[in-house]
Amino acid sequence: MTLSFVTRWRDELPETYTALSPTPLNNARLIWHNTELANTLSIPSSLFKNGAGVWGGEALLPGMSPLAQVYSGHQFGVWAGQLGDGRGILLGEQLLADGTTMDWHLKGAGLTPYSRMGDGRAVLRSTIRESLASEAMHYLGIPTTRALSIVTSDSPVYRETAEPGAMLMRVAPSHLRFGHFEHFYYRRESEKVRQLADFAIRHYWSHLEDDEDKYRLWFSDVVARTASLIAQWQTVGFAHGVMNTDNMSLLGLTLDYGPFGFLDDYEPGFICNHSDHQGRYSFDNQPAVALWNLQRLAQTLSPFVAVDALNEALDSYQQVLLTHYGQRMRQKLGFMTEQKEDNALLNELFSLMARERSDYTRTFRMLSLTEQHSAASPLRDEFIDRAAFDDWFARYRGRLQQDEVSDSERQQLMQSVNPALVLRNWLAQRAIEAAEKGDMMELHRLHEALRNPFSDRDDDYVSRPPDWGKRLEVSCSS
């Protein structure tokens, strides 16, 4: 089958990019590809059998028209000016059978005009982390970019130490970022901001294109998508680590996996990025930061959208987030209905978990085994203060009995939303260290395991992290 590519971005937004081709690595070789995703995208298996090829930037497929995008943004709350694709190149937009498109974005593809002081490269460590994280999030049901392939090489790339140069093929319906809009707003080119909005509506919100109120309705949906995404992050214990405006997806996708981390111990103020000295992007601050980022996006639209309309959309953010968060947390607790005491029970559980540094994922998974008429719980042994747990658990069982559903029905629901497996940093690190020594088996095993996060397991993928794996420091270097 021949793949078809379109050039919408190149043709319709000519001032938002520089056309250029990838710069190949030395002795590049494909070490992993996403068979399931490739099948979904109707990519012929033969493309993965002919060396690095397109996956390593050594060849282009017919119809591809590679380019690096320019955007700007606020980083750690401070205006950073022009940024852009410093190491990534959008190879093309694949046209799918249903008429939608999928960006092919090659990360680590070499120098671009937007590399600033960087070398345009990515290292094997960061490409493995992003591939694992994006696929883990996808199978958790959270909107995200996807990973299609990883190529490693003999080209050294210098970060804290010399590391193998690598490339990741990332795919997504769009790479539109808040930062695209900021770039032209701060250049006082509001008509180009409008062109970006029109492009987004035309291709991703086409049902609004002929509505005279399209900009308000579109921005309201961007707010809703962002609120829903952040709510989902919070329910699975995911910390992004670097929520700069240029890393915010207009479509509400999880974008740009860098120093991310899933909670091990329940620590509301968890900081996964060791460069985040002030804790701006801590786990519990993510909802507020996302709203701040939306406010920056709204500012770029103010030349052609009424400020009252923008503020009305922004005002809806908190309620949308709380609604999505509340619904999912009730499911995680096994509540089939909404009762007034639900929030208190959840907050008391969080207080217990925070005091005892309980494992976030394991706590909710073990809670899924609760039998409402039995005071016994395997979760009890996870707490030192048994009296406090017993008090909470008795009230929790009483609440379960209000819903009048069977244990098996409730447990099935809880186990479908409380994963047994999340991508803990130590699991990723173990796969990285093996891969850097030439052993790709753990990378493939972990990818396969992450496809079934809600299935019971009895291996170390679902255990507490070992001592060496706790609080691994992760930086932005990639």
Swiss-Prot record:
The keyword Transferase applies. GO terms for molecular function: AMPylase activity; ATP binding; magnesium ion binding. Its cofactor is Mg(2+); Mn(2+). Mg(2+) binds at N247, D256. HAMAP family: YdiU_SelO. NCBIfam families: adnlytase_SelO, PRK00029.1. This is Protein nucleotidyltransferase YdiU. It comes from Escherichia coli (strain ATCC 8739 / DSM 1576 / NBRC 3972 / NCIMB 8545 / WDCM 00012 / Crooks).
